[in-house]
């Protein structure tokens, strides 16, 4: 039976981001109806970590909004990492905090963070069409810094931003050059507050994207993330094909600003596809 890894997300700093990423409701350039807060209370984060681990999550990603890591964010993420690791939950801790230099990433590594998530999002050529406040090259350099720091790299992208198939191939080729251990695959969902005007990908096109990702990243853990609930809706037959086509990890629970599937029901559905839940990241 195929083994599936479950990963979960905690949005520990939300909203008020000065970047203008056209796909993100956390940008202050868009008027997204989201919760905004500076730093989530440590006790709340610990409760989330315990609850999600009990449900079977092996990965736990601490996400902060904003362009990049700074001293305050570094100290906060380090504090959370130490507190979670003291619980001895056996969670693989991931930080996702934007652009970061080598010294910052080494600091997080030493504090107990195991991997760093920084998505390329799309191709180098298409990126300027969805963001003008930072460059694709900055993203790529941060990924390289994570690897140099001895952290695991989690890096992927978004499909359905009006990019071409050539852009998808270019992004996947760039990701392959980084050899990430995990690649999140997101499907863009249209939102009236965001400037990207496009129709949601069909389930068939989304499956083609997964097949393409598997071709370029045969050894990466391909993790289906945002958009799964909308693209596949109640189409169990096509959702099950995700795992036939290469997906072997799933985001369990909510995303940054949108609701995910109810964890227990999601796990029941995954089991009904003949999948088993991994009990170790290794």
Curated annotation (Swiss-Prot):
Please give the cofactor(s) recorded in the UniProt entry for this protein: [4Fe-4S] cluster; [2Fe-2S] cluster
Give the residues the record marks as binding [2Fe-2S] cluster: 61, 96, 154, 221
Q: What class of enzyme is it?
A: transferase
Q: Does the keyword Metal-binding apply?
A: yes
Q: Which residues form the Radical SAM core domain?
A: 1-228
Q: Which PROSITE patterns match?
A: RADICAL_SAM
Binding of [4Fe-4S] cluster, residues: 17, 21, 24
Q: Has UniProt tagged this entry with the keyword Nucleotide-binding?
A: no
**Record-linked Gene3D superfamilies:** Aldolase class I
Enumerate the InterPro entries for this protein.
Aldolase_TIM, BATS_dom, Biotin_synth/BioAB, Biotin_synthase, Elp3/MiaA/NifB-like_rSAM, rSAM
MF terms from GO for this chain are: 2 iron, 2 sulfur cluster binding; 4 iron, 4 sulfur cluster binding; biotin synthase activity; iron ion binding
EC identifiers of the protein: 2.8.1.6
Cofactor info, note text: Binds 1 [4Fe-4S] cluster. The cluster is coordinated with 3 cysteines and an exchangeable S-adenosyl-L-methionine. Binds 1 [2Fe-2S] cluster. The cluster is coordinated with 3 cysteines and 1 arginine.
Which keywords accompany this UniProt record?
2Fe-2S, 4Fe-4S, Biotin biosynthesis, Iron, Iron-sulfur, Metal-binding, S-adenosyl-L-methionine, Transferase
Its GO biological process annotations read: biotin biosynthetic process
Question: Which pathway or pathways does this protein act in?
Answer: Cofactor biosynthesis; biotin biosynthesis; biotin from 7,8-diaminononanoate: step 2/2
CDD domains with a match to the protein in the record: Radical_SAM
At the top level of its lineage, which domain of life is listed?
A: Bacteria
Quaternary organization: Homodimer.
NCBIfam families attached to this UniProt entry: bioB (TIGR00433), PRK08508.1 (NF006308)
| Family designation | Belongs to the radical SAM superfamily. Biotin synthase family.
Instruction: Please report the name of this protein according to its UniProt entry.
Output: Biotin synthase
Tell me the classification of the organism that encodes this protein. Answer: Bacteria, Pseudomonadati, Campylobacterota, Epsilonproteobacteria, Campylobacterales
């Amino acid at each position: 039976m195929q083994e599936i890894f479950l990963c979960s997300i905690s949005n520990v700093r939300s909203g008020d981001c000065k970047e203008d990423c056209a796909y993100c409701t956390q940008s202050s350039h868009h008027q997204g109806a989201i919760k905004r807060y500076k730093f989530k209370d440590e006790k709340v984060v610990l409760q989330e970590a315990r609850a999600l681990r009990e449900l079977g999550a092996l990965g736990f990603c601490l996400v902060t909004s904003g362009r990049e890591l700074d001293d305050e964010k570094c100290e906060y993420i380090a504090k959370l990492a130490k507190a979670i690791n003291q619980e001895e939950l056996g969670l693989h801790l991931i930080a996702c905090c934007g652009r970061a230099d080598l010294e910052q990433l080494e600091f997080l590594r030493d504090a107990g963070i195991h991997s760093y998530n920084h998505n390329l999002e799309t191709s180098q050529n298409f990126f300027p069409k969805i963001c003008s406040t930072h460059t694709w090259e900055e993203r790529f350099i941060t990924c390289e810094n994570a690897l140099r720091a001895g952290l695991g790299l989690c890096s992927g992208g978004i499909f359905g931003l009006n990019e071409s198939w050539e852009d998808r191939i270019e992004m996947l080729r760039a990701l392959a050059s980084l050899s990430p251990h995990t690649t999140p695959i997101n499907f863009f969902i249209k939102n009236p507050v965001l400037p990207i005007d496009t129709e949601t990908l069909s389930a068939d096109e989304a499956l083609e994207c997964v097949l393409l990702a598997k071709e370029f990243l045969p050894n990466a853990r391909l993790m289906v993330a945002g958009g799964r609930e909308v693209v596949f809706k109640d189409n169990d037959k096509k959702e099950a094909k995700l795992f036939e086509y290469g997906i072997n990890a799933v985001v369990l629970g909510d995303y940054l600003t949108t609701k995910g599937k109810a964890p227990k029901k999601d796990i029941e559905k995954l089991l009904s596809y003949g999948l088993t839940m991994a009990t170790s990241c290794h």
